[in-house]
Amino acid sequence: MGIQEKTLGIRKERKLVVVPRERNHVRHASQRTRSKNYKNISKKRAQQHAFGFNIAKTLAKIQAFVWGSPADEEEESVVPLSKNSQDCVPLQWQAKFAQLRQQLHSTQKELQFVKEKCHLLQSVLDDANIDQRYLESRRDMKNIERDNLKPTENLPPSPVRAVNPLVTSSPIHMSPLQSRQRPVSSLQPPKGPNFYAKYPKLPQTNILRESPTEDSVPHAE
């Protein structure tokens, strides 16, 4: 940079001395001051919002108590302030508040359903006209009967019978290892008197008499 001077056809140029500045330091300092100012402003605004909201709420309560203003007017005066105050509330709190409100709505529905169910059951009991004292007395009688019951007698022991060796020694009930170790002679039928020789034929029944009697059934014609 320089300043040009014209005097009588002579052109002179005078240079100005430029002092170097610490630009980075100045920038950081300005940014810090700005951030501090923004923080202070945001804190002040939040305090003002909260203070104004509390004042409006207390004023609405005083008006409702003194002049007897209805609750609708009080709600109308409070709602816009609460909307303005939502700007200061973090987003996480808003999401949590919405979730809690939804849970409250669902629990209110469940409570209403349970109340209606209890009311219906009570009406059914009233229609049946059941005496509670009668039920209690019957319950007490059943308990007394159970307490006075005699203990059941123990069953006699089952008779002990000898095991049939023919069944236990049959090759069907033996393992394959035992059947291999058993000699072939043991599998053959025992030698001795024939068991079926005692019964050469089936026993015969007595033949009915051909002459009908009074006790006999009449023949069908």
From Swiss-Prot:
Which residue ranges does the UniProt annotation give for the motif CDC14-binding? 200-202
Where is the motif CDC5-binding annotated in this sequence? 165-170
Q: Does the keyword Cytoplasm apply?
A: yes
Q: How is it modified after translation?
A: Phosphorylated by CLB3-CDK1 in metaphase which is required for correct localization at the nuclear envelop and the spindle pole body, and dephosphorylated by CDC14 in early anaphase.
Main subcellular localisation: nucleus
Indicate which residues form the motif CLB3-docking.
189-195
Q: What is the effect of changing S175A?
A: Reduces the phosphorylation rate of CSA1 by CLB3
Could you list the residue ranges forming a coiled coil in this record?
Answer: none
Q: Show the GO cellular component annotation of the record.
A: cytoplasm; nuclear envelope; nuclear membrane; nuclear periphery; spindle pole body
Per the record, residues carrying Phosphoserine are S158, S170, S175
Where does the record say this protein resides?
Answer: Nucleus membrane; Cytoplasm, Cytoskeleton, Microtubule organizing center, Spindle pole body
Q: Which domain of life is it from?
A: Eukaryota
According to the UniProt record, where is the region Disordered? 142-221
Signal peptide interval: none
Q: Where is the composition biased (Polar residues)?
A: 166-188
Annotated GO biological process:
positive regulation of protein localization to spindle pole body
Outcome of swapping S158A: Reduces the phosphorylation rate of CSA1 by CLB3
Q: What else does the entry mention about this protein?
A: Present with 3420 molecules/cell in log phase SD medium.
Q: What is known of its domains?
A: The PxxPxF motif called the CLB3-docking motif mediates CLB3-specific phosphorylation. The CDC5-binding motif contains phosphorylated Ser-170 and is essential for tha recruitment of CDC5 to SPBs in metaphase.
Subunit note: Interacts with CDC5 and CDC14.
State what protein this is by name.
CDC5 pindle pole body anchor protein 1
